[in-house]
């Protein structure tokens, strides 16, 4: 599973470096731009990340078909941290990383890349999904 995740992040990184906008990949599949980006700040060693469990995957499945881009930034080690920073830069959300250090939470970004919410394992799947869906209409 870790190899698959690393491969996906590597592919996204290569697309970014090759000049292929990440949003255009999403647009080609759905026919529209995302109205919200849900970004999970993750690290394998993070207790809060473990407490969050499969919520992010469940959100992705529950909101399939909605104009939501789900991204996981992995801060487990120097290599994954570097890739996470490159991906954040490509998405235009780098300033939020400085304002929201750490892991174990999900940030929601609107179309202008402004943070519209921060969610942790203290919120239920239903609560986080409702917060995301307020931007989907």
Model-derived features: positions:
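Boundary at the C-terminal end of the N-terminal hydrophobic targeting segment
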Residues: 24-27
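Short active-site neighborhood of thiol/selenol oxidoreductases, capturing the structured segment around
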Residues: 32-44
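Positively charged n-region of N-terminal signal peptides that target proteins for export
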Residues: 1-6
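Typically the conserved alpha-helix immediately C-terminal to a functionally engaged Cys/Sec
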Residues: 50-64
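Thiol-based oxidoreductase modules, predominantly thioredoxin-like and allied folds used
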Residues: 65-84
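Bacterial N-terminal signal peptides
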Residues: 10-19
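Non-catalytic, surface beta->alpha helical segment in thiol-disulfide oxidoreductase systems
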Residues: 101-137
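Structural micro-motif
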Residues: 89-107
């Amino acid at each position: 599973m870790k190899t698959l995740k690393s491969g996906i992040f590597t592919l996204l990184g290569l697309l970014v470096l090759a000049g292929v906008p990440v949003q255009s990949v999403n647009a080609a599949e759905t026919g529209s731009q995302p109205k919200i980006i849900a970004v999970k700040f993750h690290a394998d060693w993070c207790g809060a990340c473990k407490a969050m469990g499969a919520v992010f995957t469940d959100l992705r499945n529950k909101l399939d078909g909605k104009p939501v881009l789900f991204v996981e930034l992995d801060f487990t080690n120097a290599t994954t941290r570097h890739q996470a920073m490159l991906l954040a830069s490509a998405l235009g959300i780098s300033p939020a990383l400085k304002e929201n250090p750490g892991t174990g939470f999900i940030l929601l970004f609107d179309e202008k890349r402004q943070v519209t919410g921060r969610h942790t394992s203290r919120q239920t799947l239903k609560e986080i999904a409702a917060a995301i869906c307020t931007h989907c209409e």
